[in-house]
Amino acid sequence: MGFDEFQPGDKFHFDRSKLVMCLYFTFAEIDGASQGAAWFCPVAVRATEIDSVVGGWSRALACFLHRFFLGDHGAQTVGIPFTYQDRDFVIFAKLSNLVSDGDGFRKAVGWRGASSLRPSLVHGNVLKKDSDLFARRPGFVEIDCADPSLLHKTTTAEFQDSCDLVAEATQRYNHGDISKAMLDNIKKTEGLNYIPGGLCFDPRLRGLIEWFDAVTVDWMHTFLQEGVMNVEALLAIHAFVLDPNLFKAFLQDKPWNFPHAFQFKGQGLWRIFSATRLDDTGEVDKIRATASELLGLYSLLRHFLFTEVARPADLNANWLSFTACCDLLDYITDVKKKLVPMSHDMLCRKITIFMLAHVGCYGSQYVKPKHAWMWAVAERWLLDTDVWDAFIVERLHLRVKQIAAPLRSLHRLERTILSGVLNDQMRNLQTFHGACCLLGNSPFALSSLPDTLFGDEMHVLGMLLRVDDVVFHGDNAGLLKACVLEDGVLYGVVELWQPIGVVTPHAKRWHSQTGDVRLIDACEMDQAYNIGPIYLANRK
């Protein structure tokens, strides 16, 4: 389950009156949960309406969870009945993941946020930087901690005790028993605000819906949304005195060939270094990029620094810090695409390597609360079998956007949005075939192979692959020639290329048109992020 605010329109035409909080859910067992058609939108409510309710979004979320899981037709109590192919079924479900960004959790939980004394919702012994408190009492660390063994994950019981303390302190203050200063100190030390009827303070949910255990700090916001990679990329640009115009030309002028699914965004990455995103002097004072843009940029920045920029020995520590961050992001994306096993221990080792490299180079000056959130991302890997993130929530917002943007009247806005989203989803479900399926309206069969379907595009574990995309199979690169479905299994017809040289640890040169055509299981393939001149395949 994920939730986030969304404002229909564009960056030049803001309409605060249409700011909508949307909540989406899916079932983890659904094959193809990475596709939008598998996600449902039961809640879309204007922020202005939420703000008029005592308890705001926190109370609204608590009421929804109670009704959805514990109500008269609750998924956790009596189940959800349905009929399929003349057979009756009942689905029972409980909350496993609750995904949002930091601001979303602040509104939903009453958490005081990343700038508070306790900047981590998941680890209760992490304190803000330069608090001068962690050394006074054993068991506490600050956000620059690089040792996961020193972290303490807050239990549900401990969190509920903190909520009870804040609620009681608020009640005593209202009765005049304690001062405002004491109340503020209690809220500061617990890292929570009191929200009447809110998620933390609703007794109906306790012991029945373990929502705190379901809190999922996602890697997308942690690394790519004013996050860890934003900081690290900016520091690398400054350390190596990178000319933004030179890098913009590198992105703009070379004939990069991106996968069809990312072609539009990939070909526009140069805009990150255009004049409108730089400071008044034309320098890079901040990485102004969306999460998807930064995800496409970091590998190209690494390649550019490796091949086009001198790296003197005195900047070796800066280089190690940047590449360790890139390696960490490489690993997370590989796990998400199921190319490598999901390992909590491996993720923690990579976070430790990066944090030691970063703090060893820069100290704690540039460490942000989101550096501590990396450990919260790792905590979920002990419980989950898939990598859940907010990318799907951002994509689902597009479904809401196409319905809400043209609306001029606010009368019954929520009903209009929800009915439109439901109708759109019903149409999408007509072509939904799971995590791995052929796409498009014209798959065809050959007379010699009547039970085999061929197509130009397929969906594979969250990836959109299309004919003429460059793909990887292990360490081999090649060109996708056709998409094939046979006996319920997806394959790619791939012309493998011949490697002719290593450029960097992440890029090789290849000779194309080898004639070595093979049938490869689609689940074993990966996308090449970008292809440069002379068939330079840059995997990450």
Language-model features: where?
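Charged (Asp/Glu and Lys/Arg) segments that form or flank catalytic channels of large polymer-
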Residues: 1-6, 65, 70-308, 312
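Structured nucleic-acid-interacting core domains from mobile-element enzymes and related host factors
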Residues: 1-17
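Short helix/loop capping segments that flank catalytic or ligand/cofactor-binding pockets
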Residues: 9-12, 34-35, 128-132, 399-401, ...
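A generic structural signal for short coil/turn motifs at secondary-structure boundaries
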Residues: 10-12, 51-54, 309-312
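Compositionally biased, low-complexity linear motifs
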Residues: 14-27, 134-139, 403-425
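E2/UBC-UEV (E2-variant) core
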Residues: 16-80, 129-175, 180-183, 486-540
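Catalytic cores of large soluble enzymes that bind and process phosphate-bearing ligands
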Residues: 56, 60, 112, 293, ...
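Terminal interaction-prone segments of large eukaryotic proteins
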Residues: 257, 263-540
